[in-house]
Amino acid sequence: MANSNNFSKTNAQQVRKQNQQSAAGQGQFGTEFASETNAQQVRKQNQQSAGQQGQFGTEFASETDAQQVRQQNQSAEQNKQQNS
C-alpha cells in the first residue's frame, strides 16, 4: 500500500493574524478578572479567618481535662499489667 503524504500549505499571514487576535483577547480577560478581585476585601477576610482559628484552638483545648486523661491512662496501664 502506497503512503501518500498530503501536505497543506500554511498561510503565515493568517497565523499571524490569529495570534494577534488571541493575544488581544488574553489581555481583555486578564483585565476583566483582575478587576473583579478586591485585594483589600481579601486581606480583611484573611485576617478574620486567622482570628477565628485562634478562637477554635482555645475552645477545643479547654474541653480537654489533662489531669483526667492522665488518670485514665494510668488506670488503663494498671489494668493491662494485671491482665498480662
UniProtKB/Swiss-Prot annotation:
Pfam families in the cross-refs: SASP_gamma
Region feature (Disordered): 1-84
Keywords associated with the record: Repeat, Sporulation
Parts forming coiled coils: none
Tree of life domain: Bacteria
Site (Cleavage): E32, F33, E59, F60
Upregulating conditions: Monocistronically transcribed in the late sporulation phase and cotranscribed with mutY and/or fabL during exponential growth. However, sspE is not translated during this period.
Skewed-composition ranges (Polar residues): 1-25, 34-44
Biased composition range(s): Low complexity: 45-57, 71-84
GO terms under biological process: sporulation resulting in formation of a cellular spore
Sequence repeats: 21-47, 48-74
Job of this protein: SASP are proteins degraded in the first minutes of spore germination and provide amino acids for both new protein synthesis and metabolism. These proteins may be involved in dormant spore's high resistance to UV light.
Protein family: Belongs to the gamma-type SASP family.
Protein name, UniProt field: Small, acid-soluble spore protein gamma-type
Organism: Bacillus subtilis (strain 168)
Gene behind the chain: sspE
